[in-house]
């Protein structure tokens, strides 16, 4: 695990301990039961069935490697723009310390449109999954580089028991083998190495031979142009998680349409 990932995971464990003291499980369960669910996997499949790219459009203010991506940051406006320009789903950063995200951003983005929403954070404990359900998320991210296989399987089972979809993220073939032990159809291949932050879309292409036909590859990071999109679609990769390219554009939704449609 990289130094930055080590630091993030350590902070997450501290955050979970603090959150459990301030918001007990029973209170969260009540909040979660009051939330409706949107079909995250179904939204992606519907786009693909129509012959379109299935885009998970990210609402992200900043990152540790790139700093602030967008100064004028209004999650509700961004979400509406994505929805109007063909996104299948949203991804919203809720990590505060490293990505300047917020639970409030997820709530605002989801309230502004009808798209299913992924809670983008570093999940290390089942408590965060219940939190995700309570804040209105429809899906969670599990990062193979941060979790051992038994824990990842347990977290997936708990997420599914709450009705949440799971996107499992990998960067290399060993992590892909780990991910393939899960039941989720959504296999995210992160083109960014979390150890070095180097990015190459070849990472996705090099792992396609491992993917069973019933699974859906979601290529993540480094998709910055129409050329990158065309390269992926030519290899039959039709689901994308994109943040930086949209966040740096004057009009995020228009940039989505320009790159994908």
UniProtKB/Swiss-Prot annotation:
CDD domains: IGPS. The keyword Ribosomal protein does not apply. It catalyses: 1-(2-carboxyphenylamino)-1-deoxy-D-ribulose 5-phosphate + H(+) = (1S,2R)-1-C-(indol-3-yl)glycerol 3-phosphate + CO2 + H2O. Pathway: Amino-acid biosynthesis; L-tryptophan biosynthesis; L-tryptophan from chorismate: step 4/5. Its EC number is 4.1.1.48. Keywords: Amino-acid biosynthesis, Aromatic amino acid biosynthesis, Decarboxylase, Lyase, Tryptophan biosynthesis. InterPro entries: Aldolase_TIM, Indole-3-glycerol_P_synth, Indole-3-glycerol_P_synth_dom, Indole-3-GlycerolPSynthase_CS, RibuloseP-bd_barrel. The keyword Lyase applies. Belongs to the TrpC family. This is Indole-3-glycerol phosphate synthase. It comes from Burkholderia ambifaria (strain MC40-6).
């Amino acid at each position: 695990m990289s130094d930055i990932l080590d630091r993030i995971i350590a902070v997450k464990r501290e955050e979970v301990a603090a959150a459990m003291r301030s918001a007990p499980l029973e209170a969260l369960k009540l909040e979660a039961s009051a939330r409706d669910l949107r079909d995250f996997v179904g939204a992606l499949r519907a786009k693909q069935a129509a012959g379109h790219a299935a885009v998970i459009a990210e609402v992200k203010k900043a990152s540790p490697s790139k700093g602030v991506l967008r100064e004028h940051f209004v999650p509700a406006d961004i979400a509406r723009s994505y929805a109007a320009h063909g996104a299948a789903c949203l991804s919203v950063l809720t990590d505060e310390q490293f990505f300047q995200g917020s639970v409030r951003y997820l709530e605002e983005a989801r309230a502004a449109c009808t798209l299913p929403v992924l809670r983008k954070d570093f999940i290390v404990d089942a408590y965060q999954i219940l939190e995700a359900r309570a804040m209105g998320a429809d899906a969670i991210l599990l990062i193979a580089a941060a979790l051992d296989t038994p824990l990842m399987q347990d977290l997936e089972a708990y997420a599914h028991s709450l009705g949440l979809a799971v996107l499992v993220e990998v960067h290399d073939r060993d992590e892909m083998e780990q991910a393939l032990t899960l039941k989720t159809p959504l296999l995210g291949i992160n083109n960014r190495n979390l150890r070095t932050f180097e990015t190459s879309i070849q990472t996705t292409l090099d792992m396609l031979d491992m993917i069973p036909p019933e699974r859906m590859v979601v290529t993540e990071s480094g998709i910055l142009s129409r050329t990158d999109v065309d390269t992926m679609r030519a290899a039959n990769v039709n689901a994308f998680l994109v943040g930086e390219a949209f966040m740096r554009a004057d009009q995020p939704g228009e940039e989505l349409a320009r790159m994908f449609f």
